[in-house]
């Protein structure tokens, strides 16, 4: 990994400026009361202007919003790589591979559910390292097995792990073995050759938290699925909060899991977020609450060591949340949901 020419001061200053332009609670309250056309007009008056103007002649309503959100997200993250040099560039590029992982899981889920490829394409985020050609090839796959074969043939880091997990998927009939293989591969490459020093110690701590929360999500997803699968077998190495055995136990008792987090190093920073987790009455709400907790935690780390990669990662998470929220509001409005129902759909 390159260690010379890193420029955290410059990148952090640019990121802070971008962060200040993110939508706040007042703007979300406005969006909830708007039609999709009104949401698009408001977006045109903000950082999404370029995308709305470029796409406005071809799309309208929710389609326009969806495409503008995804293109803006990719542009914002391309800017991060354009600004960064040396070691900082390497760290950001590795983290942004999360969108390759997202796209692999999105394609697999789409094939599994029989969703039209055009609809699956709408949910892809082209902000990682996968080329458009590779993503289009995956969208054309006629089966999950074929998609896995294409990932292997393209030499991606996910191919061999997915091939190893395919038999477990075939036997269980649930996607968890495949999704877990993607997550494990992603985090393995993130942690590989990561030299921990003053500039990266907080980043390593954040990655531990992200892995801890991913393990918690996976454990509860397994418990909800009813599949005869041991959660310990799908434990992701690299966290600090759970052992594989403890995770298998917590999968059966959410209160014990929450209490374990409260008593951990995360407890003081996440008291409010943990209250949200405690009151979540569905798996989706539970996962959203965990995502909120992770974002809240990343914010605290960014202030501890501002001249590192951590503020950049915190911005990436915040930008993702903004895009997810605007998308949820637009889709909810199109589906005829009430204001209160829409508010439950975003973070």
UniProtKB/Swiss-Prot annotation:
Family: Belongs to the V-ATPase V0D/AC39 subunit family.
Xref: InterPro entries: ATPase_csu/dsu_sf, ATPase_V0-cplx_csu, ATPase_V0-cplx_csu/dsu, V-ATPase_V0D/AC39_subunit, V-type_ATPase_csu/dsu, V-type_ATPase_csu/dsu_dom_3
Superkingdom of source: Archaea
UniProt function note: Component of the A-type ATP synthase that produces ATP from ADP in the presence of a proton gradient across the membrane.
The species this protein was found in: Haloquadratum walsbyi (strain DSM 16790 / HBSQ001)
Keyword Membrane: yes
Subunit structure: Has multiple subunits with at least A(3), B(3), C, D, E, F, H, I and proteolipid K(x).
The keyword Membrane is assigned to this record: yes
NCBIfam families found in the cross-reference section: AhaC, PRK01198.1-1
GO biological process annotation, one example: proton motive force-driven plasma membrane ATP synthesis
Localization per record: Cell membrane
Record's bilayer topology term: Peripheral membrane protein
GO molecular function annotation: ATP binding; proton-transporting ATP synthase activity, rotational mechanism; proton-transporting ATPase activity, rotational mechanism
Pfam families for this protein: vATP-synt_AC39
GO terms under cellular component: plasma membrane; proton-transporting V-type ATPase, V0 domain
Name of the protein in question: A-type ATP synthase subunit C
Keywords (A to Z) from UniProt: ATP synthesis, Cell membrane, Hydrogen ion transport, Ion transport, Membrane, Transport
